[in-house]
């Protein structure tokens, strides 16, 4: 059933085609703005709060106050239509909300079409037909432009002579100035000073023919994420995990850790090696060069050897707390680690389909290995994020809340950041921003990761602190640049307008 046509002030609003029109002029608005205008018309003369607008226009979507404010501003601009004499359509009532200030008339669809068809285009004011012929003649004569006087024409010519003279003089001065500049000045883009404490993690070759490609790629992504998070949390190095970032651009990082999968003949057979190379960009020297043959059970041993080799190459001893953390977050079997990293890779993507798949894989891991409690916690995190985007039914939500209550009390998960990530998202979904803020800051104290800073940005945005939110989002993208992190910023928990909240990041990505 089509929505009825309504006249709001001078504008005829046709919701079925998302158009407003007046005096023969038609404007097409976004569906959300049309819904907002129709809701104002349905409550003409009433003061509507932001919460009422969110509940009735945005319905089940989670939006912030600035989204409502921005939509009201766009609607006001469209209704004004560059008309300085336009009446005030929507007034702001301080500390109350907004109010429609113009009269409203409702029509049926047929009446609205007749009104639109019968509305003539604006025409200039006509001369009355009862005037005398002599009067008409006078009107016609006055409409004829008078001849330009010679004095005015002469002044006009003098003006253009001086204008072109000064323009030519300015061009000559500019050419002389440009010719005197030293054109051999260095380009600023090429002057990048390396930071020896920064490390980039890149992936060169992503697959081998002799090993299942999805497992191979997700294993490398998981190892890279673990190395980046460990160094960022337990050392003074700043690591940028660029495995998901495919832009070839200059970097200021003093070191580069490259992961590649290569086929090489060994003992008359082709084998797939995972090559790990750490290069010091200051002098081009190789600090670490290792190759691993991955089998179905040595994934955990390879990862432990890599961490130990990095510790020696970087002269960075691993603290005891890191050793304890790794014991809690990693399984004790290599084959299980590959399955866990595949589920974790889906979590990194962040979209609905990937989160659903991550929940399924983690559920299988928990069922087959109930002693791996960290997988249970990560499944709870995935499920609460899914609930924030597509609310679960009452039975599913009750089961999830019970599972979360059980997980946060497990002693083997004490002092792990994932517990506070779960608490932060759960509180944020319920609108408890202060509780969420406290939880995610505790999580950041325990672990410096891109996901923690994405969640911190979401909390700041809900608190109306967009400047702090922009800093948090930029930190997250700096730690793990790429499409995955950008998707989390734009769509995780609730939708974020990157051009509005993080304009620098929007311009940076547009320059690619």
From Swiss-Prot:
Mutagenesis / variant outcome for changing residue 474 to A: Confers pH-independent cadBA expression. Decreases inhibition by cadaverine
Record key words, sorted: Activator, Cell inner membrane, Cell membrane, Disulfide bond, DNA-binding, Membrane, Transcription, Transcription regulation, Transmembrane, Transmembrane helix
Residues in the Periplasmic compartment per record: 181-512
Transmembrane segments: 155-180
Intrachain S-S bonds: 208-272
Mutation effect (residue 471 to A/N): Confers pH-independent cadBA expression
Reported impact of residue 30 to R: Enhances the DNA-binding affinity and induces constitutive cadBA promoter activation independent of pH and lysine
Domain notes: Contains a cytoplasmic DNA-binding N-terminal domain, a transmembrane domain and a periplasmic C-terminal domain. A cluster of aromatic amino acids within the transmembrane domain is important for lysine-dependent regulation of CadC. The transmembrane domain of CadC is important for the interaction with LysP, but the periplasmic domain of CadC is also important in facilitating correct positioning of the two proteins.
Protein's name in the database: Transcriptional activator CadC
Organism of derivation: Escherichia coli (strain K12)
Gene name of the record: cadC
């Amino acid at each position: 059933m089509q929505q009825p046509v309504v006249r709001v002030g001078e504008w005829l609003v046709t919701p079925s085609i998302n158009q407003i029109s007046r005096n023969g002029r038609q404007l097409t608005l976004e569906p959300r703005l049309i819904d907002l205008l129709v809701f104002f018309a349905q409550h003409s003369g009433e003061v509507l709060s932001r919460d009422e607008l969110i509940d009735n226009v945005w319905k089940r979507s989670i939006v912030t106050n600035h989204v409502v404010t921005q939509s009201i501003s766009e609607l006001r601009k469209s209704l004004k239509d560059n008309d300085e004499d336009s009446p005030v359509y929507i007034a702001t009532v301080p500390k109350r909300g907004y109010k429609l200030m113009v009269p409203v008339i409702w029509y049926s669809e047929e009446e609205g079409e007749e009104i639109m068809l019968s509305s003539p285009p604006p025409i200039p004011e006509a001369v009355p037909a009862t005037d005398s012929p002599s009067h008409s003649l006078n009107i016609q004569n006055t409409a004829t432009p008078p001849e330009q006087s010679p004095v005015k024409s002469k002044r006009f010519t003098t003006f253009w002579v001086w204008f072109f003279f000064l323009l030519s003089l300015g061009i000559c001065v500019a050419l002389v100035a440009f010719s005197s500049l030293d054109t051999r000045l260095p380009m600023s883009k090429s002057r990048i000073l390396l930071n020896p404490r920064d490390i980039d993690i890149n992936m060169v070759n992503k697959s081998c023919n002799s090993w299942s490609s999805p497992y191979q790629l997700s294993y490398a992504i998981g190892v890279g994420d673990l190395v980046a998070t460990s160094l960022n949390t337990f050392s003074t190095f700043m690591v940028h995990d660029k495995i998901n970032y495919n832009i070839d651009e200059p970097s200021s990082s003093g070191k580069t850790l490259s992961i590649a999968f290569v086929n090489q003949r060994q003992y008359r057979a082709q084998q797939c090696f995972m090559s790990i190379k750490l290069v010091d960009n200051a002098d081009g020297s190789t600090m670490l060069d290792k190759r691993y043959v991955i089998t179905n059970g040595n994934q955990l041993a390879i990862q432990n050897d890599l961490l130990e080799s990095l510790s020696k190459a970087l002269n960075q001893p691993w603290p005891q707390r890191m050793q304890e953390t790794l014991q809690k977050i990693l399984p004790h079997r290599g084959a299980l680690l590959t399955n866990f990293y595949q589920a974790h890779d889906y979590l990194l993507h962040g979209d609905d389909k990937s989160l659903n798949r991550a929940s399924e894989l983690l559920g299988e891991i928990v069922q087959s290995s109930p002693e791996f409690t960290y997988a249970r916690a990560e499944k709870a995190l995935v499920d609460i994020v899914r609930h924030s985007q597509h609310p679960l039914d009452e039975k599913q939500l009750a089961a999830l809340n019970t599972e979360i209550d059980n997980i946060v009390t497990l002693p083997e998960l004490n002092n792990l950041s994932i517990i506070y990530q779960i608490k932060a998202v759960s509180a944020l979904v319920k609108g408890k921003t202060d509780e969420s803020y406290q939880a995610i800051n505790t999580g950041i104290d325990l672990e410096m990761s891109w996901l923690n800073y994405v969640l911190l940005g979401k909390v700041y945005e809900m608190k109306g602190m967009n400047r702090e939110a922009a800093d948090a989002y930029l930190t997250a993208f700096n730690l793990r640049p790429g499409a995955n992190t950008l998707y989390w910023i734009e769509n995780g928990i609730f939708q974020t307008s990157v051009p509005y909240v993080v304009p620098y990041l929007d311009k940076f990505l547009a320059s690619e």
